[in-house]
From Swiss-Prot:
Its main location: mitochondrion. GO terms for biological process: mitochondrial genome maintenance; mitochondrial translation; regulation of mitochondrial membrane potential; ribosome disassembly. The lineage of its organism: Eukaryota, Fungi, Dikarya, Ascomycota, Saccharomycotina. InterPro entries: EF-G-like_DII, EFG2, EFG_II, EFG_III, EFG_III/V, EFG_V, EFG_V-like, G_TR_CS. It is found in: Mitochondrion. It comes from Scheffersomyces stipitis (strain ATCC 58785 / CBS 6054 / NBRC 10063 / NRRL Y-11545). One of its GO terms (cellular component) is mitochondrion. This is Ribosome-releasing factor 2, mitochondrial. Keywords: GTP-binding, Mitochondrion, Nucleotide-binding, Protein biosynthesis, Transit peptide. NCBIfam families: small_GTP. GTP binds at residues 47-54, 111-115, 165-168. The gene is MEF2. GO terms for molecular function: GTP binding; GTPase activity.
């Protein structure tokens, strides 16, 4: 922190004049969609809820000239938060994409939600980002959701910049927050600027600017004179060192720390230091910038900025940091691309092990002018669909990221997930919820396709060829980018139409919502005649209700939110054989179960095993299961059925899947972690008159009959969470008792907040010692006073049901000082006492 006692008249230049000297270009010289790939940045704004993501994004839009006025969350007039629920609640629910010009670059920004219920929105956004701006609340520091999203980004090797926001708030601590960045996020840092304060008439520090460490300049904003923050006073600190001695001293020490950190990574810094007569301040800025950029791209360190977005202070330097230090699409890790010569199972959410074994090698090369080239084919376009939304006037809009080639309007694309060919008439770039039509979307950019209501879904791979007559090779027509994983839903709510006449529109609205948000699931309780909608949390389903009733005007009733339970087979029974009335179609099955992830189960190692990903089930069609009649028909070429062997196998799978979703014998809940083994099956392929629906019915009936015959061997599964409760040590006993008694928690450990990993803590302390941090006015003795000795983390495994409403109880116990977060770890078989408690929810006892 830097404090000046008064504002004296100084020699200064304006921000515009200073940037004309220190930047390559101030204004974008060409159309936004024509910006070269090396000057394109795809970034996400990530953080904990209420850290200021949307507020910062709105300032970026304003300062870039994209908007004429600043949108504010509190006033409900933001560009990126455009849903009525977002504007009313003041939170981000859907990720929003927008492109802006800045300093002769194009920045594609995705503003993501911060609430844990909308984690899937963050997950799918991270898949198409090249860099991220992590925003931290300067008062709260590194919060739980920040850690989670940071780890997600790190696992994807995404370089990051940190921005300490809300420096105008009482209790904001820049250095304290940077210490937490080092310790909790486990990253080195370089301070690109530090906060500057002036004392008010009451002798209170007032945040009014930042000291730029690289350029040795003091940047001052005056919200009273210029509330929009466009005019910035730029003061040469070195020339005015006598007027600002503390500012100069802080900048010098910060520069020294920066050089020392960079010197451990880049020998060019050491060479430049020696050439500069070992003067830290004489190292050329371009050398420092290049070293910071290289270190950031390799995730060696994180550049740190600070500001107050709401007060319009510090956002422009952050935008400069984005274009200087975050990667272009030319500098990212090549995405995982596969191509299978065999067709995968067509049923949605089915993964077949045998298809994985036949993947073909896909070659990739980065072209410095056009970007990634796949299969040595510059005419090939490869893109990933990562989001679908419904626009008020444009209809269905699919967001996609182009990884190679160029997608042009009025072209033909192939969805390699489904094999469908689609005609793309128009392409768009997005401005919040407003589309802007363009002729093409080139490699490294994010665009939108309209139409194709049911033809493209989240996670689908799209390919196109600029020479239609040549078409695709077999490899290219089967190219697939790594799909986007969809987490299992944890909460349910029954939804009912108010009248029979409202049912059709209700179903259409639900279909739209689930198309936009794949983390929403819909099932039907046949016994109760109810539609069940499942989501990630209570807030998630509250938003669904608001959108249905208020936005879509659907006349529906949503019941109270309940936890999503499942049923499973506890003990395997004998095999069961089902035959059609004519006797020509038959199937024999066995059922079993397992615990844990299907991919890790020994059942998945067997030939013919396929995972039904949605409920962690496995279907095994044994290679020997096909009947002798079918084999002979193949060998003797007497196959008259219009269905191929592959088609018939998929019908068997679909029949089994339908039965699993129809539910178990206890409460009719869908089955989970269950194995269906097809021992034998027969279909009269020599007779073209037999319909495939007979095989579908027989397959379904075999499973439902098995369940009915062995109903006493089924049990309940409930979702279990790893819960971390962050509290002061003096109330640890009371909180622990509440967790074990009222929440049925099993406490795994109680740790000091700073000692979860001894090696990580030792590294963080060593790194902090080498990093200069200016003293915080909120702390008496600077960084030496920072201590987490009185903070504890209780780590426990808890049934999700018992954590509903826990936050209000925790706040009551801790007087508002406690927080917690939860992570889903899997389904667990309910013991007798838990089974009895769950039964009461279904009015069964």
């Amino acid at each position: 922190m830097i404090i000046a006692t008064s504002l004296r008249s100084q020699t200064f230049c304006t921000w515009r004049a200073w940037r004309a000297v220190h930047s390559t270009a101030v204004r974008l010289e060409s159309k936004l969609n024509e910006v070269p790939i090396d000057r394109t940045r795809n970034i996400g704004i990530i953080a904990h809820i209420d850290a200021g993501k949307t507020t910062t994004t709105e300032r970026m839009l304003y300062y870039s000239g994209k908007t004429k006025r600043i949108g504010n969350v509190d006033e409900g007039d933001t560009v990126t938060d455009y849903l009525p629920s977002e504007r009313q609640r003041g939170i981000t629910i859907q990720s929003a994409a927008i492109s802006i010009p800045w300093n002769n670059h194009k920045i594609n920004i995705i503003d993501t939600p911060g609430h844990a219920d909308f984690t899937f929105e963050v997950t799918r956004s991270l898949r198409v980002l090249d860099g991220a701006v992590t925003i931290l609340d300067g008062v709260a520091g590194v919060e739980a959701q920040t850690e989670k999203v940071w780890k997600q980004a790190t696992s994807l090797n995404i370089p990051k910049i940190a921005y300490v926001n809300k420096m105008d708030r009482p209790g904001a601590g820049f250095s304290r927050t940077v210490m937490e960045i080092i310790e909790k996020l486990q990253t080195r840092v370089v301070l690109c600027n530090v906060p500057y304060f002036e004392n008010s008439k009451d002798n209170d520090p007032v945040f009014c600017g930042v000291a730029d460490i690289l350029h040795v300049k003091l940047l001052k904003w005056n919200p009273e004179i210029d509330p929009h923050g466009k005019n910035i006073t730029v003061i040469d600190i070195e020339a005015e060192r006598d007027t600002y001695p503390e500012v100069y001293e802080t900048v010098v020490k910060s520069r020294e720390s920066m050089v020392e950190t960079l010197g451990e990574f880049d020998e060019a810094i050491i060479d430049s230091f020696l050439e500069s007569n070992e003067d830290y301040m004489n190292i050329p800025i371009n050398v420092l910038n290049e070293a910071i950029r290289k270190a950031t791209l390799e995730n060696y360190l994180t550049p740190v900025y600070c500001g107050s977005s709401f007060r319009n202070i510090g956002v422009q330097p952050l935008m400069d940091g984005v274009v200087k230090y975050l990667p272009s699409p030319l500098q990212i890790s090549v995405p995982e691309i596969t191509s299978s010569a065999t067709k995968n199972v067509k049923i949605k959410h089915v993964k077949a092990k045998q298809a994985v074994k036949q993947d073909m090698e896909v070659t990739t090369k980065m072209n410095n002018r056009t970007g990634l080239v796949v299969n040595a084919n510059p005419n090939l376009t490869l893109a990933l669909a990562f989001k679908v939304m419904t626009h008020a006037t444009r209809g269905v809009m699919t967001f996609f990221r182009v990884y190679s080639g160029k997608l042009v309007s009025n072209s033909i694309i192939t969805n390699t997930t489904t094999g469908k060919k689609l005609h793309v008439k128009k392409l768009f770039m997005m401005h919040g919820d407003e589309p802007e039509e363009v002729k093409h979307i080139s490699s490294g950019n994010i665009g939108v396709i309209t139409g194709h209501e049911d033809d493209i879904q989240t996670g689908d791979t799209l390919v196109s060829h600029s020479h239609l007559k040549k078409g695709f090779s077999e490899m290219e027509s089967n190219l697939k980018l790594l799909p986007i994983e969809i987490p299992p839903p944890l909460f349910n709510s029954a939804i009912e139409p108010q009248t029979a006449g409202d049912e059709a529109y209700m179903k259409e609205c639900v279909r739209i919502l689930t198309r936009e948000d794949p983390s929403l699931k819909v099932s039907v309780d046949e016994e109760m005649g109810q539609t069940i909608i499942s989501g990630m949390g209570e807030l998630h389903l509250d938003i669904v209700k608001e959108r249905l009733v208020r936005d879509m005007k659907a006349k529906v009733t949503l019941r109270d939110v309940a936890v999503s339970y499942k049923e499973t087979l506890l003990n395997p029974g004998s095999s069961y054989k089902q035959t059609s009335e004519s006797g020509s179609v038959s199937i024999e099955i066995e059922m079993d179960s397992f615990e844990g992830a299907a991919e890790e189960s020994s059942f998945f190692e067997e030939n013919g095993a396929m995972i039904i990903a949605e409920d962690n089930n496995i279907i095994i069609i044994e290679p020997s299961a096909i009947s002798q009649n079918m084999l002979k028909a193949l060998e003797e070429r007497r196959w008259k059925s219009t269905y191929s062997l592959e088609d018939l196998q998929e019908i068997v799978i679909q029949g089994c899947l339908t039965a699993l979703q129809m539910g178990g014998p206890i409460f009719g809940l869908s089955l989970h972690s269950t194995v269906i083994r097809v021992k034998s099956w027969d279909f009269p392929v020599a007779d073209s008159s037999v319909a495939s629906t007979v095989l579908l019915d027989v397959s379904r009936s075999a499973v439902t009959s098995y369940i009915a015959t062995n109903r006493d061997w089924f049990g309940i599964l409930e979702p279990i969470m790893e819960t971390r409760v962050y509290i002061d040590s003096d109330i640890m006993g009371e909180v622990s008792h509440d967790l074990t008694q009222r929440c049925q928690a099993v406490i795994k450990s109680i740790e000091d907040e700073s000692t979860q990993d001894v090696d990580a803590l030792a590294w963080a302390k060593d790194e902090a010692e080498k990093t200069f941090l200016p003293p915080d006015y909120t702390m008496k003795a600077g960084k030496d006073a920072i201590s987490y000795k009185n903070k504890k983390i209780i780590i426990a495994e808890t049934p999700l049901r018992e954590m509903i409403g826990y936050l209000s109880r925790l706040r009551s116990i801790t007087q508002g000082r406690g927080t917690f977060d939860m992570t889903y770890i899997g389904m667990r078989r309910a013991i007798k006492s838990r089974f009895d408690a769950i039964s009461k929810e279904f009015n069964f006892m």
